[in-house]
Amino acid sequence: MTTDTTGRTGNPAAAASPDRFRYGFLKGNPQLTKNGELKHLLSIEGLPRSIVNHILDTAEQFVSVTDREVKKVPLLRGKSVFNLFFENSTRTRTTFEIAATRLSADVLNLNINASSTSKGESLLDTINNLSAMHADLFVVRHASSGAPYLIAEHCAPHVHVINAGDGRHAHPTQGLLDMYTIRHYKRDFTKLRVAIVGDILHSRVARSDIHALTTLGVPEVRAIGPRTLLPGGLEQMGVKVFHNLDEGLKGVDVIIMLRLQNERMSGALLPSAQEYFKTWGLTPERLALAAPDAIVMHPGPMNRGVEIDSQVADGPQSVILNQVTFGIAVRMAVMGIVAGNSD
């Protein structure tokens, strides 16, 4: 869904069009071993349903760890996890750190502002140096789409890479935790109508969610938003597009709200935040148009009074905080699975 491309240099360049995503220098599926096992998690696109379900099933086993007096299992004891966040994050970085710690891994958070990359060192030189320190797993967030693919191609063979968000392209662990949340409350994906609302054009979460939902057999995925914030190509993916929020919400079982990604916008795509809320904000009245037992989700950070009303965010149908809780178990599952697979 995005044509952001990556050069073979240390500083990937993001192109403007969001319609396709291809890396011509990669052969086959770079996420999988020769035996079809998950070695890296770079995108949900192209993953077999069996692998997605395996991650969700494994996460279900880890949820109970949170309730233990000692919140640890020894799965990654002796392994080193490097969190490489070239783009700011609070929620994602923290949950990855907690997840790795609960797996008994040694965790290092690279201070990008104080690292050699801020002094002109290329991305690949940084990765090669960290690989030489016998890192086992890189968790990477980068502003340029494709950066985790570049790292996965060039890192040492023993290193595993998890994409924690790259540009507008993908946020696979968020997509997986969203799927876990939906499965927890709704169980059967094949009977659901799911609406994704808001700034889909700039949202890597939306892309990952759409790929995950279609992979898991959801029969109706709706994209709802203003024309200026919807990418092309949605219909070709089997997504129903709505430019009216009230129409799009009718009868849906799951609502995934997205914030406005102002930091990724170039030019004025909307009149104002206040006007946006009047037309596109999820209020109790609009929520009533959905199925009576519909759940409301949000990947965060959440902007109250812009895309969602506080009464909805804090209401009985909101599962937003549970998404955060489930996210730890899902990231534990992903790290545990990839670290156990190698060519």
Swiss-Prot record:
Annotated function: Catalyzes the condensation of carbamoyl phosphate and aspartate to form carbamoyl aspartate and inorganic phosphate, the committed step in the de novo pyrimidine nucleotide biosynthesis pathway.
Keywords of the record: Pyrimidine biosynthesis, Transferase
GO terms for MF: amino acid binding; aspartate carbamoyltransferase activity
Catalysed reaction equations from the record: carbamoyl phosphate + L-aspartate = N-carbamoyl-L-aspartate + phosphate + H(+)
Binding positions for L-aspartate per the UniProt entry: K119, R204, R259
Family per record: Belongs to the aspartate/ornithine carbamoyltransferase superfamily. ATCase family.
Gene3D superfamilies: Aspartate/ornithine carbamoyltransferase
HAMAP family: Asp_carb_tr
Iron-sulfur listed as a keyword: no
Pathway: Pyrimidine metabolism; UMP biosynthesis via de novo pathway; (S)-dihydroorotate from bicarbonate: step 2/3
A biological-process GO annotation: amino acid metabolic process
SUBUNIT field: Heterododecamer (2C3:3R2) of six catalytic PyrB chains organized as two trimers (C3), and six regulatory PyrI chains organized as three dimers (R2).
Protein known as: Aspartate carbamoyltransferase catalytic subunit
GO cellular component: cytosol
EC number from the UniProt entry: 2.1.3.2
